[in-house]
A protein has these predicted regions:
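TRAFAC-class small GTPase G-domain
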Residues: 1-182
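Polybasic, Ser/Thr-rich amphipathic helices
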Residues: 183-188
Length: 188
């Protein structure tokens, strides 16, 4: 009797200030939809998506959309520890959301292992005329925080899939690395 090795369910957490477009980013990736007007997320929402990788493997991800308001941070912090990856989103048209990135990175580092794959995403690049944060500023912030940087538009869908493709590959490799270390510890 053969047993098929199943990939685990990878949990990816979306973090960032309120109104940066986390829910739109979430819906664009999960359902390929965009709503111009929507209510702010209260607490958390999650959905599971099966993703086919370039090499033909399929994996399941559970994407968690979190509330960005300060009053919900205690609730969302409980989910940090079980995350395999974190996408930290800011709005390129709102400088304050960019300036808060360091606070988010500090929270992430306090709550999760340094082994959790984290990426920084500048959203709303479709609104070029109102842009307040340059791509170079986003790249500099990511470099300072030691994480990768991407830009996207949840509205148009631009660059959403490449962000997830890169993140999922890094998460799988990271998961294998961490598990190999655990295996070595338990067997030494």
């Amino acid at each position: 009797m053969t047993t098929e090795k199943k990939e685990p369910l990878y949990k990816i957490l979306l973090l960032g200030d309120s109104s940066v477009g986390k829910t739109c980013f979430f819906m664009r990736y999960i359902e390929n939809t965009f709503q111009e007007i929507h209510m702010s997320t209260i607490g958390l929402e999650s959905k599971i998506k099966t993703v086919e990788l370039d090499d033909g493997r399929t994996v399941k991800i559970q994407l968690w959309d979190t509330a960005g308001q300060e009053r919900f941070h205690t609730i969302t912090k409980n989910y940090y520890k079980t995350a395999h990856a974190i996408i930290l989103i800011f709005d390129v048209t709102e400088k304050a959301t960019y300036q808060n990135v360091k606070n988010w990175v500090e929270q992430i580092r306090e709550e999760v292992s340094s082994k959790v794959v984290t990426v920084l995403v500048g959203n709303k690049i479709d609104d070029e005329e109102n842009r307040k944060v340059t791509k170079e500023e986003g790249e500099a912030m990511a470099k300072e925080c030691g994480i990768s940087y991407f830009e996207c538009s949840a509205k148009t869908g631009e660059n959403i899939d490449p962000i997830f493709n890169d993140l999922i590959k890094k998460t799988i490799e990271n998961y294998k690395f961490v598990n190999s270390k655990i295996y070595i510890i338990f067997n030494s």
